[in-house]
Amino acid sequence: MVAALLSHPTKVPQTPVPAAFPDTSKNPIEIDTNTIKLLERLSLVDLDSDQALDTLKSSIQFADKIANINTDNVQPLYTVLEHQQLQLRNDQVTAGNCREELLRCAKRTDEDYYVSPPGNIPLEQ
């Protein structure tokens, strides 16, 4: 069954490719308060807790680890569904001018924009 699925031409290696990942856990991640404030403003996520900062630091270490992977001989994929023909449709507007109707669906708006609560801070009632 698996062999039948993999019989199409593919750029994905059929066997695991060994890769050496650098150990980034020994590199201390230092984030200054200005960077934290900027990230909070851009992401709408409160980073005041130690758990949030630890998650941010581990995410940075993971990104640093995968950024150093050698991809010299890896062909790029255009889609993960490379064995299927993707059907595209013409981009034609069939309905429009419904801004007011859509804005009425939101709990809060400001001018013609939706107002969303920060990611981990409850919206005040």
From Swiss-Prot:
Q: Which reaction equation describes what this protein catalyses?
A: L-glutamyl-tRNA(Gln) + L-glutamine + ATP + H2O = L-glutaminyl-tRNA(Gln) + L-glutamate + ADP + phosphate + H(+)
Question: Which Gene Ontology CC terms are recorded?
Answer: glutamyl-tRNA(Gln) amidotransferase complex; mitochondrion
Q: Give the EC number(s) under which this enzyme is classified.
A: 6.3.5.-
Q: What class of enzyme is it?
A: ligase
GO MF: ATP binding; glutaminyl-tRNA synthase (glutamine-hydrolyzing) activity
Q: Does the keyword Nucleotide-binding apply?
A: yes
Q: Which InterPro entries is this protein grouped with?
A: Asp/Glu-ADT_sf_sub_c (IPR036113), GatC (IPR003837)
Lineage, top-rank taxon, reads Eukaryota
Q: Give the range the annotation lists for the signal sequence.
A: none
Q: What subcellular compartments does it reside in?
A: Mitochondrion
State how it assembles: Subunit of the heterotrimeric GatCAB amidotransferase (AdT) complex, composed of A, B and C subunits.
Q: What does this protein do?
A: Allows the formation of correctly charged Gln-tRNA(Gln) through the transamidation of misacylated Glu-tRNA(Gln) in the mitochondria. The reaction takes place in the presence of glutamine and ATP through an activated gamma-phospho-Glu-tRNA(Gln).
Q: Which family does it belong to?
A: Belongs to the GatC family.
Additional facts recorded: This protein may be expected to contain an N-terminal transit peptide but none has been predicted.
Q: What is this protein called?
A: Glutamyl-tRNA(Gln) amidotransferase subunit C, mitochondrial
The scientific name of the source species is Drosophila mojavensis (Fruit fly)
